Regions:
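Class I SAM-dependent transferase core
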Residues: 1-74, 78, 111-114, 118-125
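Conserved SAM/SAH cofactor-binding pocket of Class I
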Residues: 65-152
Length: 152
């Protein structure tokens, strides 16, 4: 098992996540707010498989954090089909201390966009949310040169 896989296995909750990924208490508080909003919104909007909610730290947050670690110098990240915000919104929260970093989230479902906006505001994540289909976004953003493109 590689180092990133070991980190994900160890990140069973906020404390172990902080230790595994070397993040601040402030970042953990932001992710805890995200987790709370995810639970609340999940009742009315299908954001993740319901069976995965108890493993939000290891299954969703740690998986997303591993991607952030693979591209530490990325300045512009594009997350397609953002849905519940994985990995894009988690990466944006982890990189919130970098004023040169920007995350673009593309999601066609309006309810999911509202969720993404709610989490972004609460967690103070610098993101641009594009409420449209990927094809529409591609037509409108031809000059956007992303360092990383992700989709889950």
């Amino acid at each position: 098992m590689n180092a990133e896989g070991k980190r994900a296995r160890l990140a069973q909750g906020p404390e172990s996540f902080a230790e595994a990924f070397k993040v601040s208490h402030e970042t953990i508080h932001r992710l805890e707010a995200y987790s709370s909003l995810l639970e609340r919104w999940q009742k009315t909007t299908n954001l993740v498989a319901p069976s995965t909610l108890p493993q939000v730290w290891s299954r969703h947050f740690a998986d997303s954090a591993q991607l952030s670690a693979l591209a530490p110098k990325a300045r512009l990240w594009l997350d397609l089909g953002s849905g519940g915000g994985f990995p894009g919104l988690v990466v944006a929260i982890l990189r919130s201390g970098d004023p040169n970093f920007r995350m673009h989230l593309v999601e066609s479902n309006q309810k999911k966009c509202a969720f993404l906006g709610d989490v972004a505001r609460t967690a103070k994540a610098l993101v641009d949310i594009h409420p449209m289909r990927i094809e529409q976004f591609a037509e409108n953003a031809q000059s956007l040169r992303a360092d990383v493109v992700s989709a889950r």
